[in-house]
Amino acid sequence: MARTWLLLFLGLRCQALPSGIAGTPFPSLAPPVTLLVDGRRHTLVVCLVLDAAPPGLDSLVWFSGGNGSALDAFTYGPSPAPDGTWTSLGQLSLSSEELEAWEPLVCHTRPAAGGLNRSTHPLQLSGEEASTDRTCPQETLRGTQRQVLRLSVLRLLLFKLLLLDVFLTCSRLCVLAGQHLLPPPSSKQAPASTHQSWT
């Protein structure tokens, strides 16, 4: 379930990520998102690795901070992509107190044992301007709720119109079927006259 949520998240936030070159893993950092967990601010960072090594090979994904230390992160994959390649994910959650100690963040990947590491550009997480852009404002959430409500009302109206169309179609079919089942009107011929006129 978590992997599905992350794939949806990346599909919405990173719709134009470049792919790897000649089967070389290519790590990309998604824009960080600020969440409230138990009343505390946490920054979620996701690293998407395209053209990762298939299962069975030692393909690593990890994060490092500005001081060069590796950070504990959750990794998912590799998962098959529609184009036949493999994709891996790395997820890192940092509290607001840890941001300054670990930034800038870098995502690293290594295709196999002895392979060359590939890294992303450093990602700065703190800063007044950047944090405003990454935090989901309440007005945005309210706007999303309004859009969901409008979409639900529109779906309800379309469903009612569909039911009305089905009802009218069924009524018409019943009328036509009833006409076909009625016996044809009997044509009674007048009895032949036995009276002969004498001339």
UniProtKB/Swiss-Prot annotation:
GO terms for cellular component: plasma membrane. Found in CD45+ but not in the CD45- fetal liver cells. It comes from the Eukaryota. Residues 117-139 are annotated as: Disordered. It is a single-pass type I membrane protein. Residues 1-16 form the signal peptide. Glycans are attached at residues 67, 117. GO terms for biological process: alpha-beta T cell differentiation; negative regulation of thymocyte apoptotic process; thymocyte apoptotic process. The chain crosses the membrane at residues 156-176. Disulfide bonds join 47-107. It is found in: Membrane; Cell membrane. Residues 17-155 are extracellular. Residues 177-199 are cytoplasmic. Keywords: Cell membrane, Disulfide bond, Glycoprotein, Membrane, Receptor, Signal, Transmembrane, Transmembrane helix. InterPro entries: Ig-like_dom_sf, Ig-like_fold, PTCRA. PANTHER family: PRE T-CELL ANTIGEN RECEPTOR ALPHA (PTHR37866:SF1). Heterodimer with TCRB; disulfide linked. This heterodimer assembles with CD3 proteins into a signaling-competent pre-T-cell receptor complex. Interacts with RHBDD1. Component of the pre-T-cell receptor complex (composed of PTCRA, TCRB and the CD3 complex) that has a crucial role in early T-cell development, particularly alpha-beta T cell differentiation. This is Pre T-cell antigen receptor alpha.
